[in-house]
Design a protein with these regions (language model features):
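Solvent-exposed, non-transmembrane alpha-helical starts
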Residues: 52-56, 101-104, 161-167, 212
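Active-site-flanking beta-strand signature of metal-NTP-handling nucleotidyl enzymes
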Residues: 38-46, 91, 148-154
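Glycine-rich beta-strand-turn "strand-cap" elements at beta-sheet edges
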Residues: 29-37, 77-86, 111-149, 157, ...
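An amphipathic, aromatic/His-enriched active-site/gating alpha helix that lines ligand/cofactor pockets
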Residues: 61-77, 93-127, 176-183, 202-238
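A structural feature that tracks compact, well-ordered secondary-structure segments
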Residues: 44-45, 58, 62-66, 76-79, ...
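Bacterial N-terminal signal peptides that target proteins for export
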Residues: 1-13
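Bacterial N-terminal signal peptides
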Residues: 11-21
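Structural beta->alpha junctions
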Residues: 46-50, 94-95, 154-159, 203-204
Length: 254
């Protein structure tokens, strides 16, 4: 009986150890999933005169195939300057560095880079951003002619960084959660210049955007931050191609 008791004790200890290790592995896996920092880039590109259609074609191929075939490519958006159709912007979000490297090695990206010299001018500006808040609705965007895109660049005054972040982050979270017309909000700070924020937003319509501006949470944000801000730059953009996976949620404060 003593032998059986000892054997039972050993078996229970082994089982306890196995369950403990499994729990640790699950926690570790969860931490790996939530701790990954997305790659967030905005590109400003000059398009040669008469090459707008060629740019749209190669860009559509790159965007569509990447969103469809690459699990880590979360959002790719092409927009144009309303007043200068030869000035284009690409907004790209990847799950992590590995996902971005996968995209750079893809055939559709290589096709884009091979055709770029005959389509683009020498004006190529990459804005590398530290993701602060990245969110979109649970389903992929189904683009239509009513949708609008906004991009704003804001310089936060020195010493106001923490207060500004504390004000703007909950406003973005609430906007996406409670407003049907807010389809995506992507916000980040410029790498090397953390006082510079860029916001890219997609709305279901102009009326949805105007309704957003009247919400209590947006008005609260305006009143809280009006003394914190320096220069603001508003980009006058129109959507060209909007593609995303849907269900993106990254909050640097969580």
């Amino acid at each position: 009986m003593k032998f059986l008791h000892n054997q039972y004790t050993i078996t229970m200890l082994i089982l306890f150890f196995a369950l403990t290790m499994l729990a640790v592995e699950r926690v570790h896996a969860k931490e790996q999933k939530t701790s990954a920092i997305p790659v967030f880039n905005i590109f400003e590109l000059g398009v040669q005169a008469g090459k707008a259609a060629a740019y749209d074609t190669v860009g559509e191929n790159n965007i569509t195939r990447s969103i469809t075939n690459e699990p880590g490519t979360l959002s790719m958006v092409s927009v144009k300057d309303k007043e200068n159709p030869n000035l284009a912007y690409m907004i790209e979000i990847y799950a992590d560095d590995a996902a971005y490297r996968t995209h750079l090695a893809s055939p559709q990206y290589k096709a884009f880079t091979e055709q770029a010299p005959s389509i683009l001018t020498d004006h190529k500006l990459r804005l590398s951003l530290t993701a602060q808040y990245l969110g979109d609705k649970g389903s992929p965007i189904k683009q239509n002619g009513e949708m609008i895109t906004n991009m704003v660049r804001i310089n936060v005054l020195p010493g106001e960084e923490a207060a500004f972040k504390a004000a703007v982050m909950p406003e973005m979270v609430q906007s996406l959660a409670v407003e049907d017309g807010v389809l995506a909000i992507y916000a980040g700070t410029l790498v090397g210049a953390p006082n510079t924020w860029l916001f890219f937003e997609i709305y279901a319509s102009e009326s949805a955007y105007q309704a957003h501006r009247q919400t209590p949470h947006f008005q609260k944000y305006l009143s809280q931050t009006q003394q914190m801000l320096g220069e603001k730059t508003f980009y006058n953009l129109r959507p060209a191609l909007l593609k995303n996976k849907g269900g993106l949620h990254f909050n640097s404060m969580e």
